[in-house]
Amino acid sequence: MKINALSEKRETEILRRLEEAGFEGYFVGGCVREAIRKEMAQTADRKVTPGGCGEESPREVITDTDIATDARPEQVKAVFHDMTVLDTGIKHGTVTVLFHADELRTPEDPAEDVNMENQGSRIPVEITTYRIDGKYGDGRHPESVQFTSSLEEDLARRDFTVNAIACDRHGELTDPFGGAADIEARIIRAVGDPEQRFREDGLRIMRALRFAAKLGCDIEPGTSEALSVCKGLLADISAERIYSELCKLVTGKSAGDIVRKYTDVLGVVIPELLPMKGFAQNNPYHRYDVLEHCVRAMEVVETRSDNAVYMKLAALFHDIGKPETYSEDENGIGHFYGHPSVSCRICRDIMNRLHADNFTKDRLCRIVKYHDLVFEKDRRLLKRWMNRFGAGVMLEILEIKKADNFATGNMEESLKVKFDEIRQMMEQILDEQQCFSLRDLAVNGRDVIAAGIEPGPEVGRVLKRLLADVIDEKLPNDKDVLMDNILTEN
């Protein structure tokens, strides 16, 4: 199998220079995996659409490029003596070479082919010597490494077969563990003994789940069993590393399947998920238990690239307080009074524990706390809510509300239409720049003072009264009208 996506990259010039110096050089790791996925998708598209005009998938751009070589770090430095070389991981055989775009031009490239906008920027490329890892004393890094001249020995130390593939500058693969076949079959499989791989670095447990979620893969049975056996290792992994993998996991296309199947594994780092599984809601409005309901909401919630993490987490956690607030009435119907506030508290505990950034934590908790907000097709009510929460938060709460209702399993089409119409109303308010906040008001504090109001708290009270009247459409948002109102009402 030949991978054109890599053989056409400018970084092949790095491999050429290593080869000219008498060394081997290969692309390795994620860039090879993504290039194979891209190549397979294009092949499938050509089969579906003769002439190769089908839509390209996957959409990911291959950016990070890692290179492995039999050259020792000092030899790599000598080969690239005319470049900037950083000792980014010299203990483990890694140096980073910084290239200018024009330095990656091959001899066959005309000078004008170089993108002039990129000539001032530097492209970092990690180059690592083939190695065999020693014992992992800290569950993250090998205590020692032994350099080797064998590419296969280097690939054997890697986590999963899909990441244990090398590609030369002509696009030809070296794939001793069947990684390309696993990519095609959508299987995540550990290289060698899965338990050993996970005990070397416990974060690989989260990485397995993340790759399966992102790539839409099943986890090979032996690897899957090892996940459960070794799950306790996650307790010793830093919160920041866990959180980074969790964010990638929940935004994956198969995140729901992974959360369902590996709740016990994720429960090591988020134990609050465990009571949700199998917790019957005993309510005719809900068809599923609490966890299944939340997972379904996570699967269907609409997101953007800039809010996907906290929206997916909000959907997954929005009812996490239900087990704690459950009660039954005299008819045996389940109720969860106050669960949004409890869910918000639990969310904050989780995000604090995972050392999440403040913006994500606060936005997530705000959405969860108010996910039961009542929405009506009332422009004035919507503007009041938009004033209180902000337009962006309101649109996100609406999306969570829509996903929440869909995930009951009993959502009627009329309710979906209602939510869509409410969204259109809010977007119209924004598009028409209708006034719903003090910053939109046609008058400000200086105008109120100019109208004769003494500086102080009364200025704020007047502005809030005017805003309320404008939102309720008792007054137009016109400066002359509002100034007259100040003069007559005060």
Label each PLM-derived region with a short phrase:
Residues M1-N490:
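Catalytic cores of the polymerase beta-like nucleotidyltransferase superfamily
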